[in-house]
Design a protein with these regions (language model features):
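Noncatalytic alpha-helical scaffold of FAD-dependent oxidoreductases
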Residues: 1-326, 331
Length: 333
């Protein structure tokens, strides 16, 4: 446990309500979504201002105290589980402001505690699109997405978080502020540090600000579900779709075991006798979407799909994709 004087210092810095020292509070931050051995930290501190974050990091460094950075803790890698009982957990959920959405230059700047789904919705309200859609996006944070290089159903066509990070501001373990990247499409100035930080699970620096690329949204989309007797047919269908030069924005594969585990867990009406299932979505210009949907359906039938179901509308499409995709990853990731 940190000294009483250090705890008091943190309470004065971030407010007593943002320092958690009781055993019950600390136990809540001993684990994350990964099924790994928990470790109770010595203290949990939640800064609400960037300057506070830098000071907390600096004081931990000066006192020789290990740090673990945490957002919502939805990761499946154990990245937010403390390494030892002396660790102080630094919560970034208090830094949750969307600082800018630039509709002219197509970027946004946010703090690490911003919830992914709220950010995507704010961007959509401005007529733009932020594609990365991890299954936990309703509760995950942008900082956590960057730390894990998170991706989701749209990853095949649109990529993952790493493809949208333009720049970052982070605190080194000493508490020094480091700025990397820029808000321009082309930036060859200085070392390209941001790609090293993305996916580092908070082991290299503590994120205080992220600049993310935005794109125009697709004008139309169409989603479908295809069932197969076995995995071979589904695998061949995937290869056939790509070989036909169609890159779906969603292409999710479930084998027989996954289908049944998910159905046991959430009971959403998945066909238990199916050997494999594909969730597919194409998007883009309306004419392109119709053409690609026809090609995809033909490839599916040519590879012995036993059933093809096309979503009736956008609400049904996203609801089914999100439920199935989220449960698939949560059970098997």
């Amino acid at each position: 446990m940190p000294s009483a004087s250090l705890i008091k210092e943190f309470e004065q810095l971030v407010g007593k309500e943002n320092v958690f020292s009781s055993e019950a509070d600390r136990q809540s931050y001993a684990y994350d979504a990964a099924v790994l051995k928990p470790m109770i930290p010595s203290l949990v501190v939640r800064p609400t201002e960037v300057e506070q974050l830098g000071q907390v990091v600096k004081r931990c460094y000066e006192e020789g105290i290990p740090m673990t950075v945490r957002g919502s803790g939805t990761n499946l890698t154990g990245g937010t589980i403390p390494d030892c009982s002396d660790t102080i957990v630094i919560l970034t959920t208090g830094l949750n402001k969307i600082l800018e959405i630039n509709t002219e230059d197509l970027y946004a700047t946010v703090q690490p505690g911003v919830i992914t789904a709220k950010f995507a919705a704010a961007v959509a309200a401005k007529g733009l699109f932020y594609p990365p859609d991890p299954g936990s996006m309703s509760v995950s944070t942008i900082g956590g997405n960057v730390a894990e290089s998170s991706g989701g159903l749209r990853g095949l066509k649109y990529g993952t978080t790493k493809d949208y990070v333009m720049g970052m501001e982070v605190f080194a373990n000493t508490g020094d502020l480091v700025k990397t990247g820029s808000r321009t499409v082309k930036c060859a100035t200085g070392y390209n540090i941001a790609p090293l930080l993305v996916g580092s699970e908070g082991t290299l620096a503590v994120t205080s600000k992220v600049t993310l690329k935005l794109i125009p949204p697709p004008k139309a989309s169409k989603a479908m579900m295809a069932l197969f007797k076995d995995m071979d047919g589904a695998s061949q269908a995937v290869a056939g779709i790509i070989a036909a030069h169609v890159v779906p924005c969603t292409l999710e594969f479930l084998d027989h075991a996954s289908i049944n585990y998910i159905e046991d867990y959430v009971k959403i009406g998945l066909p238990r006798d199916a050997g494999a299932m594909l969730l597919i979505e194409v998007d883009g210009h309306p004419a392109q979407v119709e053409d690609e949907a026809v090609i995809v359906e033909k490839v599916l039938r040519d590879n012995s799909a036993t059933e093809i179901v096309v979503a009736r509308d956008a609400v049904e499409k996203r609801s089914e994709e999100r439920r199935v995709g989220k449960e698939c990853r949560s059970r098997w990731s």
